[in-house]
């Protein structure tokens, strides 16, 4: 089924509102195996909407119109669709009854003739009741094309889609997806490694998405059940993770989790809780961003003892008891400083792990180091590891954000090795 979404409303074209309905509809239709091929916005103009309906009817088998179902003169979606199809508008008894109740409970409200328009549907349409508003939706098929009209306000559209429309559109198969999350490998390298799988995909499919500091892969398949989908997705996932980088490193080493909402931080926090271990941090360039990210999750008092924000050399010396002369000798952006910061954070809080971040966020270089140079230390009972990462060509905010991601990934690897 080829679907098309037409958003009706001049306010969309003038930028007064954002068309979030199209995104919601596309997502929900994809979940039931309906492919959206076109999205269009048109103003409150009958001539232009008629022209668009003519085009849509030739190229799509499902045409969904959103907005323009209200009581005012510029709400003309149903009227225009009826004219296009050569049909009349008729009243839906259930919608009329809802109007009666609405105004009976509000005697101070004037019930004018234009209010009645909200209870009308195109002749022959199946009514789609409005759970949170007054304007009834509708669905009808003419000459092999299914037309759907939905209200514009998201608070009315969403329940109508979820509870009324989708059950009527459901077929034998649905779209099932799985998201793999990768850190430490760029999108271009990942796409190059997976070129054969991407070029030859039919079903299941995979699509890469680059985000700040990480890459996600969405694996999708159409199936009649979750079990059937899992079989296909498991095969594709293993094909992906069995691939290697140009250096011979398995992609399994870069895949840290699954799902839209998962993050490196959430993985680390949950694993610390599971293992009953604690962590503390000492931060310079990130100025507490690592600690703030940890604190975003509930129940972290059991694993997060506290930390230090030591932005200046003087505070690194004073708060962490690192001799100032040593800091001056090695520099604040150095392996030595990262090591000592991590060790002192761990020691002073009696934590299992001490993590440190020191580097150059930009826009200016520091101590001869270019912007994006970051040293990250991780102290634990077995010893201290320091890594150097280069996050060049990024904004100051991105350098700090990605540095924190590297820190979480370092902790994640340590937890997995225990």
Curated annotation (Swiss-Prot):
Superkingdom of the organism of origin: Bacteria
Family: Belongs to the CinA family.
Designated name of the protein: Putative competence-damage inducible protein
Organism for this UniProt entry: Streptococcus pneumoniae (strain JJA)
